[in-house]
Amino acid sequence: MTTSHILGFPRVGAKRELKFAQERYWRKELAEQDLLDLAKALREKNWKHQAAANADFVAVGDFTFYDHILDLQVATGAIPARFGFDSQNLTLDQYFQLARGNKDQFAIEMTKWFDTNYHYLVPEFQKSTAFKANPAHYVNQIREAKALGLNFKPVIVGPLTFLWLGKEKGEAFNRFDLLNQLVPVYVEILNALVAEGAEWIQIDEPALALDLPAEWVEAYKSVYAELSKVNAKLLLATYFGSVAEHAELLKALPVAGLHLDLVRAPEQLAAFEDYSKVLSAGVIEGRNIWRANLNKVLDVLEPLKAKLGERLWIAPSCSLLHTPFDLEVEVQLKEKNTALYSWLSFTLQKVEELNVLKQALNNGRASVQAALDASQAAADARATSKEIHRPEVAERLANLPKGADQRKSPFAERIVKQNAWLNLPLLPTTNIGSFPQTTEIRHARASFKKGELSLADYEAAMKKEIEYVVRRQEELDLDVLVHGEAERNDMVEYFGELLDGFAFTKFGWVQSYGSRCVKPPVIYGDVIRPEPMTVRWSQYAQSLTNRVMKGMLTGPVTILQWSFVRNDIPRSTVCKQIGVALSDEVLDLEAAGIKVIQIDEPAIREGLPLKRADWDAYLQWAGEAFRLSSMGVQDDTQIHTHMCYSEFNDILPAIAALDADVITIETSRSDMELLTAFADFKYPNDIGPGVYDIHSPRVPTATEVEHLLRKALNVIPKERLWVNPDCGLKTRGWTETIDQLKVMVDVTKKLRAELA
């Protein structure tokens, strides 16, 4: 019989119960025990959903209060020493302080989990790091699953991926040298799981899909030789890309099974068809929301079943934490666009799709004929739908003039024209875009959407907030202002709602980091901007002040990356469609007198393919799409872009090729680490490295901000340096926001006086 299993499940709950409970706990409105009880109830629901879908194992250990890599730092005793916490006796408050910072320490750095929109907390390894096992996180969840009578499979990220994802801190050394100390701690953790009755243990090694150095690849042999001594069957799970180049190594490892992502990299199956152990085929897309064509999947699985017999397992391609919880609650979408609804599949539907595949493999296709027919009908309808393809979009892309994505003049000429009218001081200060979104603002937006607030009352509320934001910025003496984005629920969703070719869910939330969830748009068809989207708000804000007002757009690559994207045409084509649509908005802003326009691209690096060999092609089309979004603007219009959550030292030439007049970047959490690259690569345009971390409510000291600014001045000419926070301030409160910005402006004025 074919075995089915799940690699991981969404953590936040069907209705984001965990998010709201966490935030109440942080505000001291919820007792710790109540938070723990809610989390336990969520885990039970998750496991019961998996069991109801006939999964042979439920995944345990994947649930987390913030991040599974943070949990692993605790489990291995690798929490940053600078906090002074004892990993063996860590309180829940201390756990959250690691993630969010406290009055004495900034939060652990956060970055993207491979090429997804999930963020993990980056382990800080030091030469003196002393690992110590604390398996309580996993053991406690196993005990809960056992108490429910469930067959379970613990899930833990493997030691090589864990080390690879971290960074060296302090005295120079190579974190790879810590491996021999780390492996015995893993053995101790795994033994604790075995003692609780674990027969199979899933060890995730997604780093194998990267371009790992030879010594790291070779280390898999010795590491798994040690781990395999544990009295359990190990399932080595890979995902997000092909591991075919490591096929001989993986087939020789002393593990009981191997999981392959056959959605992202179906071609790799050929390299493993002679695998002699359990082969887990990841055939249901774990990162997107499109319904599978189950007949096509079975065309792949049935020959595999004939070869492998009971050694064939089936699963989603990766953890389902990247997909929304349940399509069935999307009643409005079903009523509004029945066809699109029939093409979608969320977490609960995906585990049921897996169940259909399992029944078909075990009992024949006829046993699930109705489900297969429904799947086929949806696939056929989508392939021929006229809702998806709009000829005028393809025609416009095909007929773009040569050089459409290039500015009229080089930066050196543009900046002279821009400076002539901007007349800004040295080290100009600005905000990245959003200001705090109060309960009142969110309520007004929600009431308007529900039809409970008239358009006139809604616009009055937004204008009142915009004026408040403008006045606060004037009081702080910021140089280039923003309107604050009160009208925007999300930087991608807002634009998607105003562009044709996008659809929206009501409950399609996925975790971004900690309690932060996002509701990605669904790009299902060709993209067009039917009318202006932001012009009236920026125009109104500009009418309130004599200072420069910055227009705010989200760039094409970020809209693409932070959406669930159609999979029937290349992503590059979708991205260029969005870029061209945005260019209409940019020209309308320019015509309305908004001559500083920011086109945010925080997600440009996360779109990089995992293999470097594929980078150039991606960077070429991503850069073209970005430049297309401002095609046709005049030289004296200043185009800004913003990037966050990223490391771009290795793609600086591509970032420079975007040719934005000003780039602002997130750097404070990594102590301006990005700027070390500027010693070799002289970024040609203006740059604003973030001088404080907006992910924490902590107000930075003047000394800290000055330290970062002086580091920046060491590598960036003062004439080209801007001063700004790391990112937008949407998630912060007003009190801390004012205090944080005041420190930033005061320090800037001090340095201006020095440099004058």
Curated annotation (Swiss-Prot):
Annotated SUPFAM superfamilies: UROD/MetE-like (SSF51726)
Class of the enzyme per the UniProt entry, highest EC level: transferase
Annotated positions binding L-homocysteine: 432-434, 485, 600
Metabolic or biological pathway, per its Swiss-Prot or TrEMBL entry: Amino-acid biosynthesis; L-methionine biosynthesis via de novo pathway; L-methionine from L-homocysteine (MetE route): step 1/1
InterPro entries, A to Z: Cbl-indep_Met_Synth_N, Cobalamin-indep_Met_synthase, Met_Synth_C/arc, UROD/MetE-like_sf
GO MF entry, a single one: 5-methyltetrahydropteroyltriglutamate-homocysteine S-methyltransferase activity
Binding site for L-methionine: 432-434, 485, 600
Record Pfam families: Meth_synt_1, Meth_synt_2
Positions contributing to Zn(2+) binding: 642, 644, 666, 727
Binding site residues for 5-methyltetrahydropteroyltri-L-glutamate: 16-19, 112, 516-517, 562, 606
UniProt record, GO biological process: methionine biosynthetic process; methylation
Cofactor-binding details, from the entry: Binds 1 zinc ion per subunit.
Active site residues according to the UniProt entry: 695
The keyword Methyltransferase is assigned to this record: yes
Keyword Transmembrane helix: no
Family affiliation: Belongs to the vitamin-B12 independent methionine synthase family.
Entry function: Catalyzes the transfer of a methyl group from 5-methyltetrahydrofolate to homocysteine resulting in methionine formation.
Listed name of the protein: 5-methyltetrahydropteroyltriglutamate--homocysteine methyltransferase
Gene: metE
